[in-house]
Protein backbone atom coordinates (compact mmCIF):
# COMPACT_ATOMS: atom_id res chain seq x y z
CA UNK A 1 0.00 0.00 0.00
CA UNK A 2 1.43 3.35 -1.10
CA UNK A 3 0.29 6.98 -0.98
CA UNK A 4 0.79 9.22 -4.02
CA UNK A 5 0.60 13.02 -4.11
CA UNK A 6 -0.30 15.03 -7.21
CA UNK A 7 -1.88 18.39 -8.04
CA UNK A 8 -3.15 20.61 -10.84
CA UNK A 9 -4.22 17.92 -13.27
CA UNK A 10 -6.29 20.59 -15.03
CA UNK A 11 -8.19 18.23 -17.27
CA UNK A 12 -5.03 16.61 -18.68
CA UNK A 13 -6.53 13.14 -18.43
CA UNK A 14 -4.21 11.26 -20.79
CA UNK A 15 -1.09 12.54 -19.07
CA UNK A 16 -2.63 11.71 -15.70
CA UNK A 17 -3.44 8.10 -16.59
CA UNK A 18 0.00 7.54 -18.12
CA UNK A 19 1.58 8.89 -14.93
CA UNK A 20 -0.47 6.48 -12.83
CA UNK A 21 0.76 3.61 -15.01
CA UNK A 22 4.38 4.73 -14.71
CA UNK A 23 4.12 4.74 -10.94
CA UNK A 24 2.35 1.36 -10.79
CA UNK A 25 -0.54 2.95 -8.91
CA UNK A 26 -2.96 0.23 -7.80
CA UNK A 27 -6.48 1.54 -7.34
CA UNK A 28 -7.35 -1.44 -5.13
CA UNK A 29 -4.49 -0.98 -2.65
CA UNK A 30 -2.96 2.48 -2.99
CA UNK A 31 -4.16 5.96 -2.06
CA UNK A 32 -4.12 9.11 -4.16
CA UNK A 33 -3.96 12.58 -2.58
CA UNK A 34 -4.75 15.43 -4.97
CA UNK A 35 -4.06 19.06 -4.07
CA UNK A 36 -6.80 20.60 -6.18
CA UNK A 37 -7.41 22.04 -9.64
CA UNK A 38 -8.68 18.83 -11.16
CA UNK A 39 -10.36 20.76 -13.95
CA UNK A 40 -10.10 23.63 -16.46
CA UNK A 41 -7.47 24.65 -19.05
CA UNK A 42 -7.04 21.08 -20.27
CA UNK A 43 -9.64 19.39 -22.49
CA UNK A 44 -10.78 16.42 -20.40
CA UNK A 45 -12.10 17.74 -17.09
CA UNK A 46 -15.09 15.40 -17.23
CA UNK A 47 -12.90 12.31 -17.65
CA UNK A 48 -10.64 13.36 -14.79
CA UNK A 49 -13.50 13.91 -12.35
CA UNK A 50 -15.37 10.75 -13.37
CA UNK A 51 -12.25 8.66 -12.87
CA UNK A 52 -11.55 10.15 -9.45
CA UNK A 53 -15.20 9.69 -8.49
CA UNK A 54 -14.82 5.99 -9.33
CA UNK A 55 -11.91 5.62 -6.90
CA UNK A 56 -14.20 6.32 -3.93
CA UNK A 57 -12.29 6.17 -0.65
CA UNK A 58 -8.96 5.57 -2.43
CA UNK A 59 -8.72 9.27 -3.28
CA UNK A 60 -8.34 12.26 -0.97
CA UNK A 61 -9.04 15.63 -2.59
CA UNK A 62 -8.78 19.27 -1.61
CA UNK A 63 -10.45 21.81 -3.86
CA UNK A 64 -8.58 24.45 -5.84
CA UNK A 65 -9.69 27.76 -7.30
CA UNK A 66 -10.52 26.21 -10.68
CA UNK A 67 -12.67 23.54 -9.06
CA UNK A 68 -14.60 26.26 -7.22
CA UNK A 69 -14.97 28.11 -10.51
CA UNK A 70 -16.50 25.03 -12.16
CA UNK A 71 -19.02 24.73 -9.33
CA UNK A 72 -19.87 28.43 -9.67
CA UNK A 73 -20.26 28.17 -13.45
CA UNK A 74 -22.53 25.14 -13.04
CA UNK A 75 -24.65 27.14 -10.57
CA UNK A 76 -24.95 30.02 -13.04
CA UNK A 77 -22.98 32.40 -10.84
CA UNK A 78 -19.99 32.83 -13.16
CA UNK A 79 -19.67 32.83 -16.93
CA UNK A 80 -18.44 29.75 -18.77
CA UNK A 81 -15.37 31.06 -20.58
CA UNK A 82 -13.92 29.25 -23.58
CA UNK A 83 -10.56 28.65 -21.92
CA UNK A 84 -12.23 26.63 -19.16
CA UNK A 85 -13.12 23.75 -21.49
CA UNK A 86 -16.23 23.12 -19.37
CA UNK A 87 -18.78 22.52 -22.14
CA UNK A 88 -18.48 18.73 -22.12
CA UNK A 89 -18.72 18.61 -18.34
CA UNK A 90 -21.71 20.94 -18.12
CA UNK A 91 -23.65 19.07 -20.81
CA UNK A 92 -22.97 15.64 -19.31
CA UNK A 93 -25.95 13.79 -17.75
CA UNK A 94 -23.61 13.07 -14.82
CA UNK A 95 -22.79 16.74 -14.18
CA UNK A 96 -25.16 17.27 -11.24
CA UNK A 97 -23.98 14.13 -9.45
CA UNK A 98 -20.32 15.02 -10.01
CA UNK A 99 -20.78 18.63 -8.94
CA UNK A 100 -22.51 17.51 -5.76
CA UNK A 101 -19.60 15.17 -5.09
CA UNK A 102 -17.08 17.96 -5.65
CA UNK A 103 -19.01 20.25 -3.30
CA UNK A 104 -18.48 17.73 -0.52
CA UNK A 105 -14.69 17.63 -0.87
CA UNK A 106 -12.26 19.29 1.52
CA UNK A 107 -10.05 22.36 1.58
CA UNK A 108 -7.56 20.89 4.04
CA UNK A 109 -6.38 17.35 4.65
CA UNK A 110 -4.38 16.50 7.75
CA UNK A 111 -2.81 13.14 8.55
CA UNK A 112 -1.79 13.45 12.19
CA UNK A 113 -0.08 10.07 12.29
CA UNK A 114 2.32 10.92 9.46
CA UNK A 115 2.24 14.68 10.14
CA UNK A 116 1.14 15.52 6.61
CA UNK A 117 -0.93 18.50 5.47
CA UNK A 118 -2.36 19.12 2.01
CA UNK A 119 -4.15 22.18 0.67
CA UNK A 120 -4.31 23.75 -2.77
CA UNK A 121 -2.54 27.10 -2.39
CA UNK A 122 -1.04 26.57 1.05
CA UNK A 123 -1.64 27.49 4.68
CA UNK A 124 -1.85 31.04 5.94
CA UNK A 125 1.23 31.86 8.04
CA UNK A 126 -1.13 33.75 10.36
CA UNK A 127 -2.84 30.50 11.40
CA UNK A 128 -1.91 27.70 13.74
CA UNK A 129 -3.08 24.19 12.89
CA UNK A 130 -6.21 24.37 15.02
CA UNK A 131 -7.41 27.60 13.39
CA UNK A 132 -6.65 26.16 9.94
CA UNK A 133 -8.76 23.08 10.66
CA UNK A 134 -11.69 25.14 11.94
CA UNK A 135 -11.56 27.55 8.99
CA UNK A 136 -11.50 24.67 6.51
CA UNK A 137 -14.52 23.07 8.13
CA UNK A 138 -16.43 26.35 8.00
CA UNK A 139 -16.12 26.76 4.24
CA UNK A 140 -16.61 23.03 3.64
CA UNK A 141 -19.89 23.25 5.54
CA UNK A 142 -21.09 26.18 3.43
CA UNK A 143 -20.10 24.65 0.10
CA UNK A 144 -21.74 21.29 0.86
CA UNK A 145 -24.98 22.96 2.02
CA UNK A 146 -28.02 23.01 -0.28
CA UNK A 147 -27.81 26.82 -0.38
CA UNK A 148 -24.21 26.74 -1.62
CA UNK A 149 -24.98 29.06 -4.53
CA UNK A 150 -25.65 31.95 -2.15
CA UNK A 151 -22.32 31.25 -0.45
CA UNK A 152 -20.48 31.35 -3.78
CA UNK A 153 -22.14 34.63 -4.75
CA UNK A 154 -20.69 36.25 -1.63
CA UNK A 155 -17.32 34.56 -1.27
CA UNK A 156 -15.29 36.23 -4.02
CA UNK A 157 -13.52 39.24 -2.52
CA UNK A 158 -9.99 40.46 -3.20
CA UNK A 159 -9.58 42.81 -0.25
CA UNK A 160 -9.94 40.30 2.58
CA UNK A 161 -6.26 39.53 2.94
CA UNK A 162 -5.44 39.83 6.65
CA UNK A 163 -6.49 37.45 9.42
CA UNK A 164 -8.05 38.69 12.63
CA UNK A 165 -10.07 36.74 15.16
CA UNK A 166 -12.70 39.47 15.14
CA UNK A 167 -13.45 39.27 11.41
CA UNK A 168 -17.16 39.11 10.77
CA UNK A 169 -18.49 35.75 9.64
CA UNK A 170 -18.55 36.48 5.92
CA UNK A 171 -15.09 38.06 5.84
CA UNK A 172 -13.74 35.13 7.82
CA UNK A 173 -15.05 32.78 5.12
CA UNK A 174 -13.60 35.00 2.40
CA UNK A 175 -10.19 35.04 4.04
CA UNK A 176 -10.22 31.26 4.39
CA UNK A 177 -11.13 30.76 0.74
CA UNK A 178 -8.38 33.16 -0.35
CA UNK A 179 -5.82 31.41 1.83
CA UNK A 180 -6.65 27.85 0.82
CA UNK A 181 -7.14 28.45 -2.91
CA UNK A 182 -5.53 31.71 -4.10
CA UNK A 183 -2.47 32.95 -2.19
CA UNK A 184 1.14 32.70 -3.32
CA UNK A 185 2.95 35.59 -1.67
CA UNK A 186 2.62 37.44 1.62
CA UNK A 187 3.67 40.84 2.87
CA UNK A 188 5.90 41.13 5.97
CA UNK A 189 2.88 41.69 8.22
CA UNK A 190 1.28 38.46 6.98
CA UNK A 191 -1.20 39.97 4.53
CA UNK A 192 -1.92 37.75 1.54
CA UNK A 193 -1.10 38.66 -2.03
CA UNK A 194 -3.32 36.75 -4.45
CA UNK A 195 -2.27 38.37 -7.71
CA UNK A 196 1.47 37.92 -8.26
CA UNK A 197 2.13 34.63 -10.09
CA UNK A 198 5.81 35.08 -10.93
CA UNK A 199 8.67 32.90 -9.80
CA UNK A 200 10.45 34.17 -6.67
CA UNK A 201 13.44 34.77 -8.98
CA UNK A 202 11.63 37.82 -10.33
CA UNK A 203 9.91 39.12 -7.20
CA UNK A 204 11.51 41.40 -4.66
CA UNK A 205 10.78 42.67 -1.16
CA UNK A 206 8.27 43.26 0.37
CA UNK A 207 6.67 40.15 -1.14
CA UNK A 208 7.77 36.76 0.19
CA UNK A 209 6.48 33.29 -0.71
CA UNK A 210 3.96 32.22 1.89
CA UNK A 211 6.08 29.18 2.77
CA UNK A 212 9.05 31.38 3.74
CA UNK A 213 7.01 33.28 6.31
CA UNK A 214 7.37 32.34 10.00
CA UNK A 215 4.83 29.64 10.85
CA UNK A 216 4.23 27.23 13.70
CA UNK A 217 2.68 24.68 11.33
CA UNK A 218 5.75 24.05 9.16
CA UNK A 219 7.78 23.16 12.25
CA UNK A 220 5.63 20.07 12.73
CA UNK A 221 4.11 19.02 9.40
CA UNK A 222 5.14 18.19 5.84
CA UNK A 223 3.00 20.45 3.63
CA UNK A 224 1.86 19.51 0.12
CA UNK A 225 0.43 22.17 -2.17
CA UNK A 226 -0.14 23.05 -5.83
CA UNK A 227 -1.39 26.25 -7.52
CA UNK A 228 2.01 27.69 -8.39
CA UNK A 229 3.39 26.37 -11.68
CA UNK A 230 6.04 29.08 -12.04
CA UNK A 231 7.66 27.93 -8.80
CA UNK A 232 9.18 24.87 -10.52
CA UNK A 233 10.35 23.47 -7.21
CA UNK A 234 12.93 26.20 -6.63
CA UNK A 235 13.30 28.24 -3.44
CA UNK A 236 11.20 25.66 -1.59
CA UNK A 237 12.74 24.32 1.62
CA UNK A 238 11.73 21.22 3.47
CA UNK A 239 9.13 20.40 4.72
CA UNK A 240 7.21 21.88 1.75
CA UNK A 241 6.34 19.86 -1.35
CA UNK A 242 5.16 21.86 -4.40
CA UNK A 243 3.21 19.66 -6.81
CA UNK A 244 2.21 21.95 -9.69
CA UNK A 245 4.66 21.51 -12.58
CA UNK A 246 2.57 23.28 -15.22
CA UNK A 247 1.26 20.42 -17.37
CA UNK A 248 -1.59 22.54 -18.72
CA UNK A 249 0.98 25.15 -19.80
CA UNK A 250 2.92 22.60 -21.84
CA UNK A 251 5.28 21.43 -19.08
CA UNK A 252 4.69 18.24 -17.12
CA UNK A 253 2.61 16.48 -14.51
CA UNK A 254 4.48 15.22 -11.46
CA UNK A 255 3.64 12.85 -8.63
CA UNK A 256 5.40 11.83 -5.42
CA UNK A 257 5.22 8.45 -3.74
CA UNK A 258 5.43 9.17 -0.03
CA UNK A 259 6.88 5.91 1.24
CA UNK A 260 10.15 6.05 -0.70
CA UNK A 261 10.18 9.71 -1.77
CA UNK A 262 10.28 8.79 -5.48
CA UNK A 263 9.06 11.35 -8.01
CA UNK A 264 7.34 10.41 -11.28
CA UNK A 265 6.71 12.74 -14.21
CA UNK A 266 4.88 12.83 -17.52
CA UNK A 267 5.35 15.55 -20.11
CA UNK A 268 2.31 17.07 -21.77
CA UNK A 269 1.36 15.19 -24.92
CA UNK A 270 0.25 17.87 -27.34
CA UNK A 271 -0.49 21.57 -27.55
CA UNK A 272 -4.10 21.01 -26.63
CA UNK A 273 -3.98 22.86 -23.32
CA UNK A 274 -4.05 26.61 -22.85
Curated annotation (Swiss-Prot):
Keywords of the record: Hydrolase
Coiled coil (UniProt feature): none
Keyword Hydrolase: yes
Enzyme Commission code(s) on record: 3.6.1.41
Superkingdom assignment: Bacteria
Molecular function GO labels: bis(5'-nucleosyl)-tetraphosphatase (symmetrical) activity
Catalytic EC class: hydrolase
Catalytic activity: P(1),P(4)-bis(5'-adenosyl) tetraphosphate + H2O = 2 ADP + 2 H(+)
Record Pfam families: Metallophos
Stored InterPro entries: ApaH, Calcineurin-like_PHP_ApaH, Metallo-depent_PP-like
HAMAP family named in the record: ApaH
PANTHER family: CYTOCHROME-RELATED, PTHR40942
Family membership: Belongs to the Ap4A hydrolase family.
Role description: Hydrolyzes diadenosine 5',5'''-P1,P4-tetraphosphate to yield ADP.
Official protein name in the record: Bis(5'-nucleosyl)-tetraphosphatase, symmetrical
Provenance organism: Buchnera aphidicola subsp. Acyrthosiphon pisum (strain APS) (Acyrthosiphon pisum symbiotic bacterium)
Highest classification ranks of the organism: Bacteria, Pseudomonadati, Pseudomonadota, Gammaproteobacteria, Enterobacterales
